[in-house]
A protein has these predicted regions:
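Interfacial non-cytosolic loop connecting adjacent transmembrane helices
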Residues: 36-47, 88-114
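Membrane-helix exit/interface motif
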Residues: 29-39, 60-64, 93
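Cytosolic juxtamembrane helix and N-cap/initiation of the first transmembrane helix
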Residues: 1-26, 122-143
């Protein structure tokens, strides 16, 4: 299959792949740190949450490599956008114990702060890729 259009759009699936894989890695790291901070999550719960949170972005990742890029874009934008909104509120704006500015110093505090910031960055970039993909007007031709 050939695509017409600029090379930046042709690289969109690659950029999306990098972002989704980075997001998955940071989410797992973040959940492991949360488990160490609060001891409320078992390993099985961490695994289940990681799978559920990454299910839609990985579906979008697969679709980015097909002719369904617009759908992939909307899935990325929705899933990572929701994560970005929830994470920004929970870790930076709310008065919860998971606020990076109010968290008591401890062994895992720095890693928690790092993962919270990394999640914001990666999810923000993922939303940008989602917008780009959802607005794509490329025509796919089957040889």
């Amino acid at each position: 299959m050939k695509m017409t259009g600029g090379s930046a759009m042709n690289r969109l699936p690659l950029y999306g792949t990098v972002i989704v894989l980075a997001n998955c890695g940071v989410i797992v790291w973040h959940l492991l740190v949360l488990a160490r901070l609060h001891s409320m999550l078992s390993d099985g719960q961490i695994l289940l949450i990681a799978i559920l949170v990454n299910l839609i972005p990985f579906t979008a990742l697969l679709l980015l490599w097909t002719r369904f890029r617009k759908i992939a874009g909307w899935l990325l934008l929705a899933s990572l956008g929701i994560g970005l909104l929830i994470g920004t509120y929970e870790h930076f704006l709310s008065s919860s114990p998971d606020n990076v500015f109010r968290m008591a110093p401890g062994e895992w505090t720095l890693q928690f702060r790092i993962t919270a910031v990394l999640l914001m960055i990666v999810e923000g970039l993922g939303c940008w890729i989602g917008v780009k993909a959802s607005r794509e007007n490329h025509v796919f031709r089957v040889p």
